[in-house]
Regions:
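Intrinsically disordered, low-complexity regions enriched in acidic/Ser/Thr/Pro/Gln residues
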Residues: 2-158, 162-165
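Short alpha-helix boundary/capping segments
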Residues: 68, 166-170, 222
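Surface-exposed beta-strand edges and their flanking turn/coil or helix-capping segments
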Residues: 69, 77-82, 91, 118, ...
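Glycine-centered flexibility sites
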Residues: 79, 85, 148-149, 180, ...
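A general structural motif
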Residues: 137, 141-149, 167-179, 197-199
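Feature captures the catalytic cores and cofactor-binding loops of soluble hydro-lyases/lyases
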Residues: 171-248
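Short, basic/aromatic-enriched C-terminal tail that caps enzymatic domains
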Residues: 246-256
Length: 256
């Protein structure tokens, strides 16, 4: 991969990412910048990811303002409500509707947030399944290749089957979208693995725990609070996942 992998150099219009099929409307825009390299300067045309703010409204009350790519907004809303405890499960969702930069949802939770509960899932996953999932991310992250400005997240089912893949400018929104997409498609969270490119903070661990997903993996690093929360919830937490190495900080029994 070239050093300036996310730009189209004026003299090198054949760069590989420009030839890729990309159907993610509103994901990026083209701007001009100046490259300074030593004493040389030149004008470049580059793609940058688009960040927008959307309001999430549940039962007539705004519960969050989310910063995100302006795509997969229904999945974002559903995932956020599940990952933040506004819904106990996908069965509590009555409806979700996108109207411009607002997402209107109805639920059966009565406005009461739930707490994450420790998991007793006996799910097992092999390191190779994790590495194959990271290969999927590398292949599927088209917006990242165009812009260098997104995080990715995916959800695996049993035996490494792909349930969902999502990109977003926010690592939290990428996780929300991936979880929402997977659960809307019928995935069983207790038999699922969440893999992300972002660091494993307590906020990200909490999202997985709230959704009922027992295994969380990242190719980035963990934070101490994320490790402590994973231990309290009985989750498996692994980081710095790069073939052939996988570093497990909690719940090593789920890694085959």
């Amino acid at each position: 991969m070239k050093e300036s992998w996310h730009v189209e150099r004026v003299e090198e219009a054949e760069e590989f990412w420009r030839g890729e099929r990309l159907d993610r409307g509103g994901a990026f825009q083209t701007v001009r910048c100046t490259e300074i390299s030593g004493s040389e300067r030149r004008s470049l045309e580059v793609d940058v990811a688009i960040e927008e703010r959307v309001a999430l409204i549940l039962d007539g009350m705004m519960v969050a303002e989310l910063f995100c790519l302006p795509s997969q907004l229904e999945e974002l809303a559903v995932g956020h409500l599940l990952c933040e405890g506004h819904l106990r499960g996908i069965e509590d969702l009555v409806s979700a509707r996108v109207a411009g930069k607002e997402i209107f949802c109805e639920g059966r939770g009565g406005g009461m947030k739930v707490e994450a509960r420790p998991t007793a899932s006996d799910l097992r996953i092999s390191p190779e399944a994790v590495f194959k999932a990271l290969d999927m991310i590398n292949d599927a992250a088209l917006v990242w290749r165009r812009t260098g400005g997104t995080h990715s997240a995916l959800v695996l089912g049993e035996e490494g089957a792909l349930s969902s893949f999502c990109e977003d400018v926010s690592r939290s929104s990428a996780v929300d979208k991936a979880v929402g997409s997977a659960l809307m498609a019928g995935a069983d969270p207790s038999r699922s693995v969440l893999i992300t490119t972002g660091r494993l903070s307590s906020a990200i661990v909490s999202k997985a725990g709230m959704a009922g997903i027992p295994v969380l993996v990242s190719r980035a690093g963990p934070l101490n609070a994320g490790i402590e929360l994973a231990e309290r919830l009985g989750m498996t937490l692994a980081a710095f996942a790069r073939r052939p190495n996988l570093y497990v900080y909690a719940g090593k029994e789920r890694i085959l």
